[in-house]
């Protein structure tokens, strides 16, 4: 049975941890889905896989293209798609149009927006009222890299309280889940205990209701990993060796036999 947003909320109540990873193409999405991943995020982190330095340059059209491929490979997991930078911040109508295109054109079940400041809370409220499921995202928000950098957020009492307040406001706005990125574990635990919707941590400790990582980090494909990522295998080295072996056999006329 396909995973739903309401099912994720039920899993929080039952104490079942939610498994989430990113995907940007059909093959990886198919593998993740078959392996039992609950939530697949078509993240704007795809920008880095496309050679950009940050997530900011990626466009809505690029996200639509890749999200379609991901959805074609998924049968069970809930698919959530990031709205890229400046496709939802200008106005509520812009946000509704961007999010609506994601759901209509890709087959994804939800969108994710960064930030919990008042204007964003209002935008998310309107999206939910329009029937669009929304996942929130607080803490380190990569689309604000030029304002906040990539350092851990919520380390002071003031910033921790702000992030907690944002999470509460997002729940009240109607999000079905919230990503907590690169914040102290005790703050993530406090937010998780306060909310009735599931929290998905990335660099936020073990007390969240689920965890998400960038799949290229997990597989060892990334040139650099964030400090909170865990590399489970080194596919970069495996692929390099396989290509070198193939090239050697072609040059030595050993392939094809």
From Swiss-Prot:
Keywords: Cytoplasm, Magnesium, Metal-binding, Pantothenate biosynthesis, Transferase. One of its GO terms (biological process) is pantothenate biosynthetic process. PANTHER family: 3-METHYL-2-OXOBUTANOATE HYDROXYMETHYLTRANSFERASE. Its cofactor is Mg(2+). HAMAP family: PanB. It catalyses: 3-methyl-2-oxobutanoate + (6R)-5,10-methylene-5,6,7,8-tetrahydrofolate + H2O = 2-dehydropantoate + (6S)-5,6,7,8-tetrahydrofolate. It is found in: Cytoplasm. Homodecamer; pentamer of dimers. The keyword Transferase applies. Binds 1 Mg(2+) ion per subunit. The gene is panB. This is 3-methyl-2-oxobutanoate hydroxymethyltransferase. Mg(2+) binds at residues 44, 82, 114. The keyword Membrane does not apply. GO terms for molecular function: 3-methyl-2-oxobutanoate hydroxymethyltransferase activity; magnesium ion binding. Its EC number is 2.1.2.11. InterPro entries: Pantoate_hydroxy_MeTrfase, Pyrv/PenolPyrv_kinase-like_dom, Pyrv_kinase-like_dom_sf. Belongs to the PanB family. The active site is at 181 (proton acceptor). 3-methyl-2-oxobutanoate binds at residues 44-45, 82, 112. Pathway: Cofactor biosynthesis; (R)-pantothenate biosynthesis; (R)-pantoate from 3-methyl-2-oxobutanoate: step 1/2. It holds the Pfam family Pantoate_transf. GO terms for cellular component: cytoplasm. Catalyzes the reversible reaction in which hydroxymethyl group from 5,10-methylenetetrahydrofolate is transferred onto alpha-ketoisovalerate to form ketopantoate.
């Amino acid at each position: 049975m396909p995973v739903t947003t309401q099912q994720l909320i039920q899993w929080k109540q039952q104490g079942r941890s939610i498994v989430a990873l990113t995907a940007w193409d059909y093959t990886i999405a198919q593998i993740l889905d078959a392996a039992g991943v609950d939530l697949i995020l078509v993240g704007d982190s795809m920008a880095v896989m496309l050679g950009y330095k940050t997530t900011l340059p990626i466009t809505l059209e690029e996200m639509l293209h890749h999200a379609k491929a991901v959805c074609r490979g998924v049968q069970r997991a809930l698919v959530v798609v990031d709205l890229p930078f400046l496709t939802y911040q200008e106005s509520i109508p812009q946000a509704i149009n961007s999010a609506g295109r994601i759901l209509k054109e890709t087959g994804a079940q939800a969108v994710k927006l960064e930030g919990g400041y008042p204007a964003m809370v209002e935008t998310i409220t309107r999206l939910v009222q329009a029937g669009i499921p929304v996942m929130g995202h607080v803490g380190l928000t990569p689309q604000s890299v030029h304002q906040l950098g990539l350092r851990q957020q919520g380390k002071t009492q003031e910033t921790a309280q702000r992030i907690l307040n944002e999470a509460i406001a997002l729940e009240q706005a109607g999000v079905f889940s919230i990503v907590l990125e690169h914040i102290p574990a005790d703050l993530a635990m406090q937010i998780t205990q306060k909310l009735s919707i599931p929290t998905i941590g990335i660099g936020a400790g073990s007390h969240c209701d689920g965890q998400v990582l960038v799949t290229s980090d997990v597989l060892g494909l990334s040139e650099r990993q964030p400090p909170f990522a865990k590399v489970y295998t080194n596919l970069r080295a495996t692929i390099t060796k396989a290509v070198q072996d193939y090239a050697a056999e072609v040059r030595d006329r050993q392939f094809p036999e």
